[in-house]
Curated annotation (Swiss-Prot):
Catalytic activity of the protein: a ribonucleoside 5'-triphosphate + H2O = a ribonucleoside 5'-phosphate + diphosphate + H(+); a 2'-deoxyribonucleoside 5'-triphosphate + H2O = a 2'-deoxyribonucleoside 5'-phosphate + diphosphate + H(+)
Family: Belongs to the Maf family.
Matches recorded under PANTHER family: BIFUNCTIONAL DTTP/UTP PYROPHOSPHATASE/METHYLTRANSFERASE PROTEIN-RELATED, BIFUNCTIONAL DTTP_UTP PYROPHOSPHATASE_METHYLTRANSFERASE PROTEIN-RELATED
Annotated organism of origin: Trichodesmium erythraeum (strain IMS101)
Protein name per Swiss-Prot or TrEMBL: Nucleoside triphosphate pyrophosphatase
Hydrolase in keyword set: yes
EC number(s) on file: 3.6.1.9
Signal peptide feature range: none
SUPFAM superfamilies tied to this protein: ITPase-like
Amino acid sequence: MKIPSVILASSSSARLRLLKTVGINPIVMPSNFDESTIKLKEPRQLVETLAQAKAETIANSIMKEKLPEKQSNLILGCDSVLVIEDQIYGKPNDKQEAITRWQKMRGQVGQLYTGHALIDLSQNKTIVLCRMTKVHFSHVNDQEIEAYVATEEPLKCAGCFAIDGIGGLFIEKIDGCHTNVIGLSLPLFRVMLNNLGYQVSNFW
């Protein structure tokens, strides 16, 4: 079996960094899919649907271009949301929303859902899976919240925090996959590759 290249259908620097950390250097092709068109209230279904839509947008673009060198590739799409008290949160729209969100999050336990969609163009197969990690937030004070939001890091992240950045200071612990919280569960990605007949070491 010819080993394809991996296309990351995301502009997330964190997801790109995770893949490079394990020896995979993907082609980055950010999806322009409009996430606001998907209205689902169940978080697992929401992130799986969005991840698949992002990957399919890139797949359709590749097939329309009829570029043979790309038509045997694997396309990875991901999407993450945080759930606190049955409320689904993505990226905050502005600093005030981020501050208000953190005032609700502090001292709480949230569920971080990341949907993963992997399309194998050569085999015409798609695998869609989700992983959930529990995140225990610290009892941070208003001054810490305002200072953190001023860095603008929370504005770039689903869930309003980056566990691999400054936000890691305010996370007591997690239950589950660490990289899932960053935006891509590496162990789950390995399983998805296996299900398509590949070994992760094929991509090193």
